[in-house]
Each structure stands twice: as C-alpha cells, then as structure tokens.
C-alpha cells in the first residue's frame, strides 16, 4: 500500500511510484518479487512511461487537480465516498437486504447513516441527473469510478496525459458513464468535492488550496 503523498514530479515522470498493481500487465507483475525496490527504479520508470505511452509534456491542473497527489488509501476512500454520495437518494430509499448488506461492506453503519442524513444538506437541491440508482453489484471499485467520473466533470477539461495518470492510480474497473455537469454547474460540483475532502480526508485538504 502506497501511503506517501505523491509529488508533481513523481506524477509526471515516475509512474512506478504511484501505479496501482492491478494496472500492471501480468508479465510485469510476475517479476516484481525479484525487484523489491521497483517503485524507485529509474529504469523501470522509463520503461513504464513507454509501456503506457505517458506523455510528460502537459499542463498540470490546480485546485481539484491535486486529487492524484494523495496517499493511496485516502485517494480511494475519497472517491468511493463521493461515489456513494452520488447514489445518496437511492441509498436513502433502499429497503432491500442485499444492497444494504453490500453497502455495509463498504462503510460502517454510522458512515452510512451520515450519507443518508447529509444527502440534502451538502449542496441543497441536487441538480437533475447528478443522483443515480444503485448498481446491482455495489463494490468499492464501482463507487470509485463513479466518484472519479464526477470529479473530472467538475473540472475544466484536463490533459489526457494527466487523466491517464490518475486512472493508473486506481484499481481496474469498468469506467463509469460520464456525469452531466453543465459549465454553469461546475462551481457547485467543485463545492461538493471540496466539502467531501474536508469531511473524508481532512489531512489532505492542504493539497486543494
């Protein structure tokens, strides 16, 4: 587990420092036991830049663009919680045992209660299409992808090279359908993201100033 903050330099030039293991091709994973310091290897970083065709010439976004600089557990926790919040209306109305049990494998009962209670308090009335029904299989990686899709929609369009690096930090999963966030709604979407940073990963809030 990568629990260090990622620097902008590492994000740009050192994919081995932040790459999620699931993102590595199987052949690469098979040799890692023989390379205990692989995340610090200049040769492997160069090879990974080539393997994933990662362009290093891009403009780094600010504000919400600090998302991939967080420690791994904080990054996944934040996006998973955002994903759950974006299904808050469906969670509030959920009465079936199976989805409730799945939800309680992701968060404890108190956190689930907070999501339900705070649903209408975070940003006031929710814009149309921001809330979605719960998927049949409620998994952490699914909620992470939902949170990621909304987070990106809350930002101005970003360089593909930066977006690709962010996706490589996360577990493998089917990408979420894009969130419909109009340009006029971006300030509200950004407010939601910043509120969740303060609530869920307060130790990382300095990154987003």
From Swiss-Prot:
Keyword annotations: Plasmid, Virulence
InterPro entries attached to this UniProt entry: T3SS_K
Induction: At 37 degrees Celsius in the absence of calcium.
Function: Belongs to an operon involved in the translocation of Yop proteins across the bacterial membranes or in the specific control of this function.
Annotated protein name in UniProt: Yop proteins translocation protein K
Organism: Yersinia pseudotuberculosis serotype I (strain IP32953)
Gene: yscK
């Amino acid at each position: 587990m990568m629990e260090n903050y990622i620097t902008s330099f590492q994000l740009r030039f050192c994919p081995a420092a932040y790459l999620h293991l699931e993102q590595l091709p199987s052949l690469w994973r098979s040799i890692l036991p023989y390379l205990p310091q692989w995340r610090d290897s200049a040769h492997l970083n160069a090879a990974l830049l080539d393997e994933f065709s990662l362009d290093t010439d891009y403009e780094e976004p600010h504000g919400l663009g600090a998302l991939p600089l967080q420690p791994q557990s904080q990054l996944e926790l934040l996006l998973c919680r955002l994903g759950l919040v974006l299904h808050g209306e469906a969670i509030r109305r959920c009465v079936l045992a199976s989805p409730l049990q799945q939800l309680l494998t992701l968060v404890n009962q108190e956190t689930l209660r907070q999501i339900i209670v705070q649903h209408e308090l975070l940003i006031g009335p929710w814009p149309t299409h921001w809330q979605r029904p719960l998927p049949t299989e409620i998994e952490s990686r699914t909620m992470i992808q939902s949170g990621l899709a909304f987070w990106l929609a809350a930002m101005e369009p970003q360089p593909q090279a930066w977006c690709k690096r962010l996706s490589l930090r996360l577990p493998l999963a089917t990408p979420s359908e894009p969130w419909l966030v109009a340009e006029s709604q971006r300030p509200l979407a950004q407010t939601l993201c910043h509120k969740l940073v303060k609530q869920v990963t307060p130790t990382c809030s300095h990154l987003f100033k």
